[in-house]
Curated annotation (Swiss-Prot):
<dbReference type="GO" id="GO:0005525">
    <property type="term" value="F:GTP binding"/>
</dbReference>
<keyword id="KW-0694">RNA-binding</keyword>
<dbReference type="GO" id="GO:0003723">
    <property type="term" value="F:RNA binding"/>
</dbReference>
<keyword id="KW-0548">Nucleotidyltransferase</keyword>
<dbReference type="GO" id="GO:0004484">
    <property type="term" value="F:mRNA guanylyltransferase activity"/>
</dbReference>
<dbReference type="InterPro" id="IPR011181">
    <property type="entry name" value="VP3_Rotav"/>
</dbReference>
<keyword id="KW-0489">Methyltransferase</keyword>
<comment type="similarity">
    <text>Belongs to the rotavirus VP3 family.</text>
</comment>
<dbReference type="GO" id="GO:0004482">
    <property type="term" value="F:mRNA 5'-cap (guanine-N7-)-methyltransferase activity"/>
</dbReference>
<keyword id="KW-0506">mRNA capping</keyword>
<comment type="subunit">
    <text>Interacts with VP1. Interacts with VP2.</text>
</comment>
<comment type="function">
    <text>Multifunctional enzyme involved in mRNA capping. Catalyzes the formation of the 5' cap structure on the viral plus-strand transcripts. Specifically binds to GTP and displays guanylyltransferase and methyltransferase activities. Together with VP1 polymerase, forms an enzyme complex positioned near the channels situated at each of the five-fold vertices of the core. Following infection, the outermost layer of the virus is lost, leaving a double-layered particle (DLP) made up of the core and VP6 shell.</text>
</comment>
<keyword id="KW-0949">S-adenosyl-L-methionine</keyword>
<protein>
    <recommendedName>
        <fullName>Protein VP3</fullName>
        <ecNumber>2.7.7.50</ecNumber>
        <ecNumber>2.1.1.56</ecNumber>
    </recommendedName>
</protein>
<dbReference type="Pfam" id="PF06929">
    <property type="entry name" value="Rotavirus_VP3"/>
</dbReference>
<keyword id="KW-0547">Nucleotide-binding</keyword>
<keyword id="KW-0946">Virion</keyword>
């Protein structure tokens, strides 16, 4: 269970030793005030997965605590020691809708017409309150706009990179606004995967987990089902000299021009459709860049020719390189990685480009007021110029991703013609990507249109990343790691495919079989299947897992997402049962130490159950002793030893303990200590001494006689 620890010398639990931290971890409450010293503060920060607010010594923590008090209780996402994001927003108390999504910047004036008159849209990029406008503005627009996709494609608003103004009455606007605000601020009283509370928690902890995973793995990975949320992590991973085999699924289906045109005319416009064009250029840019990493490694330099307006450039402030942009139309970009030259890039500039650079070309001549004949002539001249540039650049061992046009008759494509999915406009564009000089292939106009129409049904991940579907026959290098975050668990994948991935070094996520009740009170199953019920979450259906049966079968580590984050500096304080499980099979640092995934909170399930029914601890000791003798005086003489309460917790509450520790790691450490009981650990938490083999055997006798578990890890621990 994730906890919020508030360090405050005026009140709280005294935490002066590592044993005090162990005791604190077994307290039942989520929010705890603590009085620490420097050593115990360091242990809490580094050796637990708790969110720590030092309100006396850290000004940012004091600000965060004040905000937390005004929002209490709320989820907290810590991206570093002091950079935090809360799960809700109080800017609404001033009638302000707060957003951070840069693609809204050019639309704010028109988007404001979709809100009640007394409400404002404000952009705050680094607020600790959650930017609910990123979601709310999608909803109000989608529910109030009356334009079709086809009407928008031919509108002035599209050319201006904005949205049409709202034409609904204030009464209707208020009705829709009330609906979405009621949804966003609906108090969560039960597990509800359709709630905003759940959506925010899953989105943000997913981002933290992706960051942690990609900082953990090195070398070559097989990446299964990556979504666009992983784009930043993928680029940073490749830029660090690593490599990836992508596994995605092509969902393209054949279609016809009439069918797609009819779809545009009948389908109501949505915000997602509005943003397609900006996202198209961004996705094309990164598709070509990934191709460069695969072919040449880290690019010497990165160029963007024909950059105006490219509002998406504000979304990628994280890129680990500068982007040299050329376009005579200048726009000030709020991204210090962009170096903009407000002039044309011409053939003479090619000589200045270093080899093994990456160039994205998206030159567009303004032809809006020209007749058809002139347009066609300009399109042909522009296409010839772009192709000439691309070939000359490719001859220098550069990767070039460049825009092309479809012309009547035969067309010369350099490599495969590339078509972005989900495009709203049935235009005449496609892209080529080359890394060296290649001979062109001939395509008829009709063939290119057929590919364009089919691509509309493909998914963006497959387009950007490429790769093939992962299945039970996929070949995985023994030195590679399989990474499957929120993907492989989908029920479109067979259990044979999933088990094939689990065999290798891996990091794979699954939902837990339990989503209601209290994490400390999860009953053991009477079957041995690792995979349980299919679970619907948001728009997906996943295989859920039972952690104990899973670990017994596959012999790999399993922890919740919150516990997993302890490997780095990020933390997540969310409802416990919102956590997904993370399956791990890989070499880990300090595996036999309390540095990571230690047994904090191991007593919580037993304390929770005992306290719920006012059961004395003495009852537990007597119950164990009666397994072997009715002489209860032995308990005092042995100081209540002779059995392992921790092992009882592991065996009876394994599927609960994954929310606070790694029970599998505890077993492996305990086995190690049976043969080497004087292992020194400077990270030790708790004063307990290693158990003997006899104590473990006594414990298993107790579990068996009292029929407390259906299956055990006895062979793993004692054989």
């Amino acid at each position: 269970m994730a906890k919020l620890i508030i360090i405050n010398s005026e009140k709280g639990e005294k935490v002066e030793t590592h044993e005090d931290i162990f005791k604190l971890s077994n307290l039942q409450q989520r929010e705890i005030y603590a009085i620490t010293n420097e050593r115990t503060k360091s242990i809490l920060l580094n050796q637990t997965f708790y969110t720590i607010l030092d309100i006396e010594n850290e000004p940012k923590d004091k600000v965060a605590f004040d905000s937390y008090n005004s929002l209490f209780p709320t989820s907290i996402f810590s991206y570093s020691r002091q950079d935090r994001l809360f799960g809700t927003c109080n800017h609404v108390l001033d009638n302000n809708i707060h957003y951070s999504f840069a693609l809204f910047d050019s639309m704010v004036d028109n988007l404001s017409t979709y809100l009640p008159n007394d409400w404002n849209i404000i952009k705050i990029s680094d607020s600790i309150d959650y930017p609910i406008g990123n979601d709310l503005l999608f909803y109000v627009f989608d529910n109030l706009v009356h334009m079709t996709i086809d009407q928008f494609v031919n509108s002035e608003e599209k050319q201006m990179n904005t949205v049409p103004k709202c034409k609904e009455s204030q009464d209707k606007i208020k009705e829709v606004f009330t609906d979405i605000m009621s949804h966003l601020y609906m108090p969560a009283i039960d597990y509800d995967p359709q709630s905003y509370n759940y959506r925010v928690s899953r989105r943000e902890i997913g981002n933290l987990v992706r960051d942690q995973v990609f900082s953990l793995v090195k070398g070559h990975i097989h990446l299964i089902g990556p979504e666009m949320e992983s784009l930043r992590n993928i680029i940073m991973f490749l830029h660090a000299g690593n490599s990836i085999t992508f596994h995605t699924i092509d969902t393209s289906t054949k279609s016809s021009y009439i069918k797609e045109l009819e779809f545009n005319k009948k389908t109501k416009l949505t915000m997602a459709s509005v943003l397609v064009n900006q996202r198209k250029n961004m996705n094309n840019f990164f598709k070509g860049l990934i191709r460069h990493y695969i072919t040449y490694g880290i690019p010497r330099k990165v160029y963007y020719i024909g950059a105006y307006p490219s509002y998406w450039l504000e979304l990628i402030t994280w890129v680990p390189f500068n982007i040299v942009a050329y376009d005579p139309k200048y726009r000030r970009v709020d991204n210090d990685k962009i170096i903009w030259y407000d002039r044309l890039f011409d053939r003479n500039d090619i000589e200045t480009i270093e080899s093994k650079s990456y160039i994205y070309i998206d030159i567009r001549t303004d032809v809006r007021n020209l007749d058809t004949t002139k347009k066609q002539r300009i399109f042909k001249e522009e296409d010839d110029m772009i192709v000439d540039m691309a070939i000359k650049l490719a001859s220098k061992q550069c990767t070039v991703m460049f825009k092309r046009k479809i012309f009547p008759g035969n067309n010369m494509s350099f490599g495969d013609p590339l078509f972005h999915p989900k495009l709203t406009q049935l235009g005449r564009e496609y892209y080529n990507c080359i890394t060296t000089i290649v001979s062109p292939s001939v395509y008829k106009e009709s063939e290119l249109y057929s590919l364009l129409l089919s691509a509309r049904s493909n998914n963006v991940s497959n387009y950007v990343y490429g790769g093939s579907k992962f299945d039970q026959f996929s070949i995985v290098n023994c030195n590679s790691t399989v990474v499957a975050l929120y993907s492989l668990s989908n029920t479109v994948n067979s259990l044979k495919t999933i088990e094939h991935a689990i065999k290798y070094n891996h990091i794979i996520t699954f939902p837990h079989r339990t989503d209601r009740g209290d994490w400390r009170n999860i009953e053991e199953l009477d079957n041995s299947s690792p995979f349980q019920n299919r679970k619907r979450q948001l728009e997906f259906e996943d295989w859920s897992i039972d952690p104990k049966n899973y670990v017994m079968k596959f012999r790999c580590e399993m922890v919740s997402e919150s516990v997993f984050l302890q490997l780095g500096h990020s933390r997540a304080l969310i409802p416990d049962l919102y956590n997904h499980m993370i399956s791990l099979r890989m070499e880990m640092p300090l595996f036999y130490s309390d540095r990571f995934f230690s047994h904090i909170g191991i007593r919580q399930p037993s304390i929770f159950k005992r306290d719920s029914y006012m059961t004395s601890r003495l009852s537990a000791y007597i119950s164990r002793q009666l397994t072997h003798s009715i002489n209860l005086s032995v308990l005092k003489r042995n100081h209540f030893e002779g059995y392992s309460g921790h092992l009882i917790a592991i065996e009876t509450s394994f599927s609960s303990l994954v929310f606070t520790m790694s029970p599998y790691r505890w077993l492996i450490r305990a086995k190690k200590l049976l043969t080497k009981n004087k292992m020194r650990d400077k990270f030790k938490i708790g004063d307990g001494q290693p158990h003997t083999r006899e104590e473990f055997e006594n414990t298993y006798d107790y579990l068996k006689i009292n029929r407390l578990v259906n299956s055990t890890f006895r062979s793993l621990l004692l054989d």
